[in-house]
């Protein structure tokens, strides 16, 4: 059950990432420095809750995907 919930969350995040890639607005998109809750995508430094995708440094609760360093705070 926990795996199913995590998988569902991952699918939702992928859908959001796809929507952002297609040019629809989303919170905290772009490379460089992003801070705050919501959705973050791009290289550089990310801090805050929500979903983080990309290389660099990630900090905050939620889901982290990408190279380098990531942990849940």
From Swiss-Prot:
Keywords, A to Z, come to: Amidation, Antibiotic, Antimicrobial, Repeat, Signal
Q: Keyword check for Ribosomal protein, yes or no.
A: no
* Transmembrane intervals: none
| Signal peptide limits | 1-19
Mention one GO biological process in which this protein takes part, according to its record: defense response to Gram-positive bacterium
Q: Which residues carry this modification: Arginine amide?
A: 72
sequence repeats sit at 32-37, 38-43, 44-49, 50-55, 56-61, 62-67
Tissue occurrence: Expressed in hemocytes and at very low levels in ovary. Not expressed in adipose tissue, brain, caecum, gut, heart and nervous chain.
Functionally, this protein is described as follows: Has antibacterial activity against the Gram-positive bacterium B.megaterium LM101.
The name under which this protein is listed is Armadillidin
Organism placement in taxonomy: Eukaryota, Metazoa, Ecdysozoa, Arthropoda, Crustacea
